[in-house]
Every structure is written in structure tokens, then in C-alpha cells.
């Protein structure tokens, strides 16, 4: 059976966490976090997303919520330390957005970074993330 080829985007204006295939956008006083198209490709179609409650203090690498896929429930790991200020209610009620529009309407949470300068150093730019994607998925078709 032929292996499915990854096809997805890697926007240039985001930062990426290679450990968890998550993206981060610095949005003024807050950060916005979501799953990358590669992370979604590996997890499988997301059929439910639930974020931790507003005000939750999330440490780097700890769960910011969960996603339910066809055969499993997975923790969504935070790419940095933050205080959760808003979950994307639209994505929680319509998780298909996470699959089809992960970088705009399908974002997962917003928050206030707790250690931005330190945590930022562990994130990579789009060029480095593209190299990571091609190392993991050599036949990837990146938009």
C-alpha cells in the first residue's frame, strides 16, 4: 500500500515548535497557538478539540487541551509557557476548522506568554521548520 504524502502549508510569519508540531504567532501582548498541518497529518483527522479553561497556567510541554481523532485522544502540548486567555470556541464547536484552516480560523488558544524571551529561543522560523518537515517527510509537498 502506498504511503500518503504530506501536503501542507508553512506560513512564513509564524514561529514553530519542532517537538510538538505546533505554531506560535506573537500578537502584541498575547500569543496565538495552533497545530501545524504536519501535526494534523500525523494525528489524523481531528473530530473534537477541547482547550483547558480560561486562566489556566500552562507550562512549556504540558497539555493546553486535547484533540480527539478517529482512533485516539491526544494531549495538545504547549510550545511555551503561558496563561490561557481565550480558547477558540469556533474551533471547539467546529473542529473541522483545525483540519482545514489550521493557521487562521483553526487556531486553538490565545494567551499571555510567561517567559517569552526564554521560550522564544526554542522556537524556529519557517525555513527551519521546512527543513524539519522534509527530514520527517522527504516527499512532502509544501505550499
Would you name each region that the model predicts?
Residues 50, 68, 74-78:
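Small beta-strand-rich domains/subdomains or short beta-sheet motifs embedded
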Residues 58, 64-65, 84:
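Generic structural signal for buried aliphatic residues
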Residues 21, 55, 77-86:
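Generic structural motif
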Residues 26-29, 86-94, 118:
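Short, conserved beta-turn/loop elements at beta-strand boundaries and strand-helix junctions
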Residues 39, 72, 92-93:
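A short acidic/small-residue loop/turn micro-motif
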Residues 1-60, 100, 105-115, 122-127, ...:
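Acidic, low-complexity mobile loops and tails
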Residues 73, 118-119:
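Short beta-strands and strand-coil junctions in structured, solvent-facing domains, enriched
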Amino acid at each position: 500500500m502506498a504511503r500518503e504524502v504530506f501536503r501542507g502549508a508553512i506560513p512564513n510569519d509564524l514561529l514553530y515548535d519542532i517537538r510538538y508540531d505546533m505554531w506560535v504567532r506573537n500578537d502584541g501582548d498575547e500569543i496565538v497557538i495552533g497545530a501545524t498541518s504536519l501535526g494534523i497529518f500525523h494525528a489524523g483527522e481531528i473530530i473534537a478539540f477541547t482547550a483547558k479553561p480560561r486562566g489556566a497556567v500552562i507550562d512549556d510541554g504540558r497539555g493546553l487541551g486535547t484533540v480527539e481523532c478517529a482512533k485516539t485522544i491526544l494531549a495538545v502540548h504547549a510550545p511555551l509557557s503561558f496563561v490561557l486567555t481565550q480558547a477558540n470556541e469556533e474551533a471547539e464547536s467546529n473542529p473541522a476548522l483545525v483540519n482545514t484552516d489550521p493557521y487562521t480560523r483553526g487556531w486553538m488558544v490565545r494567551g499571555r506568554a510567561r517567559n517569552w524571551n526564554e521560550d522564544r529561543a526554542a522556537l524556529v522560523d519557517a525555513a527551519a521548520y521546512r527543513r524539519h518537515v522534509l527530514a520527517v517527510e522527504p516527499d512532502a509537498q509544501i505550499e
